[in-house]
């Protein structure tokens, strides 16, 4: 009989981490009969899945660990583990700073968690494994367990871009693609469990080049075509993309695959070619615009979101104005925007940066004001339209109100029977609010 363990997992960062955290629980459950808990004080295993994109990420992790340290006094068998990108960066240093930590594991070694726990219990020594064993983890992970009608599926790991500001190639390793048939099998398993929307994940997901059993290679467009043929899958998304690999094949898929959501997240990071060169993004603004123009020729009403960095070393007011001009021209929807965060070990960390923080904060506010204005206009334009909603559950504020998302990722709240949860429903949008929409079931 398997030993029962209560597991608490705190997830920081991107959708890839959310996917990894779900798989952590599944692999632990195979060995220990685990039960999820939302209270870390009640847990037998506490894991934090970390993100290192932003500045001071390490300190946030050690602050969280400090909250858990005292639990060892009342539960000497408690296992505390640190995973994710901070674990990859810091490795043994985590144990040196926090000797009470039992496990340190990278994104590519989550499948080894049960064995690491057993080794810790046997030797009473902290276990560290931050290696990059390519896609080995997918060979050893159990079948995925769906939670609701939406699911993430990781199709590749790592990144080869080495943008000058980014730590991902150092923490996630080089690009490694999951075999084509393996991805299809995982999607089919999820569809059998009632999943209707799949989000394909990768640090540079549109550079997917998956090996096929026939010896050929499948790109993302071909993968999407095959996933769309799986019975039950009715909506497909993918993230995160790079403009360089946003290929004509992928653009054409928007014409031939109706299951592809009418929304694209395509990080451009800046609107100035000079800044893009210093970021080592390997494309120009003109090339980005040309790809968007081709996409909108196929899907005129598609909404496009992005990621933006302001205050990159050497950014002038002229550079920043070019960013604002791009946001206006493309009409970017809900997007992520940040002040540049220096990451140790990256080339950009050595660039001279003499822009005052007050100026950077002002630029960020101006950018976010423009992005929010764009998003509100798009939301108001949806009032009176009929939208196909995938019903996620009930509203956070009212258990008698259903809540779901449109193709362009808007939250819609409306009255309806709870039997609709996990299903698609047609809803007429009646009101636009700052962070959501209201509607009526048709």
From Swiss-Prot:
[4Fe-4S] cluster 1 binds at residues 14, 51, 85. It holds the Pfam family TRAM. Residues 5-122 form the MTTase N-terminal domain. Its main location: cytoplasm. The keyword Repeat does not apply. It is found in: Cytoplasm. Its cofactor is [4Fe-4S] cluster. PANTHER family: CDK5 REGULATORY SUBUNIT-ASSOCIATED PROTEIN 1 (PTHR43020), MITOCHONDRIAL TRNA METHYLTHIOTRANSFERASE CDK5RAP1 (PTHR43020:SF2). This is tRNA-2-methylthio-N(6)-dimethylallyladenosine synthase.
